[in-house]
Amino acid sequence: MKLKRLLKITVFACLLFSVVSCQNDSPEEVMYSKTSMEQQTEQKLQCLYEMYKDKPIQSLFNTTRATREVLNGECVIGAIQYCGNHFNENISKNEIVRYFGDKVQRDRNGNITGIVLNTSDWDAALNNWFTATYPYSQAYLINEIANGKIACCRLGSDRSHAVVLLGVDADAGKFIYYDSVLGGENNKAAFTEIYDPRIITKK
């Protein structure tokens, strides 16, 4: 009887030790796993910096021929409003439309169909509400966005869509961006698709 009781106590003690051990080890394992993942991401970002350190920023030229209509126009308005909200500033659609004036294109019913902008127009507009900084290289832009900054840019080979860069997917080698027309904050674009980026900070 005493032996049976002793066995029960021994089994209970082993189980208790096992539970305590698991509880003690788990946070360390999670921390190690998290640290390992962070290190991998940092290594991938470093590779991207090296790859793009000599790549210039792609921009439009300040000529009439280089002027592109930003289709729909809502993407420019949405990008500016998103940046405003990021800095707790409420920028109304009417305020933005008034600023662009005759650059705003409308249909016969008065609906906005686009906004015609070149690089100077784009830069001036962003600096009207924010401090818009020209990144001197692709690597610099990638680094700033990866470290929490945001940037407005024009997307695609026709430069006809305005979006806000929010982050970097180091695994895919792409920017993560907000799109006011398509919706969502998890859209992705290749670095080569980005034109006229401006790093946005509060004035």
Regions found by a protein language model. Name each.
Residues 1-11:
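Bacterial N-terminal signal peptides that target proteins for export
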Residues 10, 21, 58, 200-201:
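Residues marking helix boundaries in flexible regions
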